[in-house]
Amino acid sequence: MQDRFIRSITQLPTPLADALIPLLHQNFAGHIDAQQLAELVQSSQMTEAEVLLALLPIAAALAKPPISEFYVGAIAKGKSGDIYMGANLELPGEALFHSVHAEQSAISHAWLSGESQIVDMIVNASPCGHCRQFMNELVEGGQIKIHLPSQDSHLLSYYLPYAFGPKDLNVQSPLLVKHETEFALDSSDPMVIEALDHAGLSYAPYTQSYAAVVLETADGATYCGRYAENAAFNPSMLPMQMALSNLTRHNRDFGEIRRAVLVESSQGKISLVGATMDALHPVAAIELEHIVVDPV
């Protein structure tokens, strides 16, 4: 079991903890598939809702909040039945707008894993307005059920009435609908090709600034992040922040980053290169490789 879970596992009921420990191996990064979840429910003799709430301390252990020291965990349950953990991330010494919220982390985890819809969001603190707006961008976002400890469950529409969302800007295919944009690039570099593929899957209906970041560690492992825009603009999630959140969930340190690539469209209304460098340079003493590509 990873050291970061030693403290949080003691907060779980013993039967659930005993069933969960084998899953918390060195490669565990917060994903539990539907079959594994069913086995946890059976072994613990708890309801699924009780298990999901009980797992929040495990999700919170994925957090990296050096500024607030406030650990927030979130669990997104997909239509597939799989669950995806996420946690808040703050960049040390940097402006707060670089922060990743736990709900954003969990949703990006699900998105990168190929999930097509989120049906439940379990979180250990009430979602802030930023996260409510971010969730509203998703497929059937208003129908996502929000679960909080010691509170009744409610739909997102309860927390965000009279919501402004994609349809108000004539976007009919919201976040998590699979979007594929083709780009032209002649490269044999696997890391660049990976970034190109993820840029094609990014979500940028408001600026067409399709983009992705891939980070590589010294052992050759890669961690990606895609751009995810929002109808309210400010809650958009930048690809570098998503990639850093992804890396952190996998229990890797910023100091292990040896290479960073940003691929973005030449036809976007904005460029993400400045914001990407702003997030990278405080955590890794490397240069960003910036590649601009043309849509096919």
Curated annotation (Swiss-Prot):
What is the cofactor note?
Binds 1 zinc ion.
- The residue ranges of the CMP/dCMP-type deaminase domain are 47-167, 186-296
Where do the annotations place substrate binding? 88-90
- E.C. designation(s): 3.5.4.5
Q: Where is Zn(2+) bound in this sequence?
A: 101, 128, 131
- Gene Ontology cellular-component terms listed: cytosol
Q: Which Pfam families match?
A: dCMP_cyt_deam_1, dCMP_cyt_deam_2
List the catalytic residues.
Answer: 103 (proton donor)
BP GO terms, sorted: cytidine deamination
Q: Name the CDD domains for this protein.
A: cytidine_deaminase (cd01283)
MF annotations from Gene Ontology? cytidine deaminase activity; identical protein binding; zinc ion binding
SUPFAM superfamilies recorded: Cytidine deaminase-like (SSF53927)
Query: What is stated as this protein's family in its record?
Result: Belongs to the cytidine and deoxycytidylate deaminase family.
* Source organism (scientific name): Shewanella sp. (strain MR-7)
Q: Which InterPro entries match?
A: APOBEC/CMP_deaminase_Zn-bd, CMP_dCMP_dom, Cyd/dCyd_deaminase_Zn-bd, Cyt/Deoxycyt_deaminase, Cytidine_deaminase-like, Cytidine_deaminase_bacteria
Q: Is this entry keyworded DNA repair?
A: no
Q: What does this protein do?
A: This enzyme scavenges exogenous and endogenous cytidine and 2'-deoxycytidine for UMP synthesis.
**Name of protein:** Cytidine deaminase
Q: Which cofactor does it need?
A: Zn(2+)
Could you tell me what reaction this enzyme catalyses? cytidine + H2O + H(+) = uridine + NH4(+); 2'-deoxycytidine + H2O + H(+) = 2'-deoxyuridine + NH4(+)
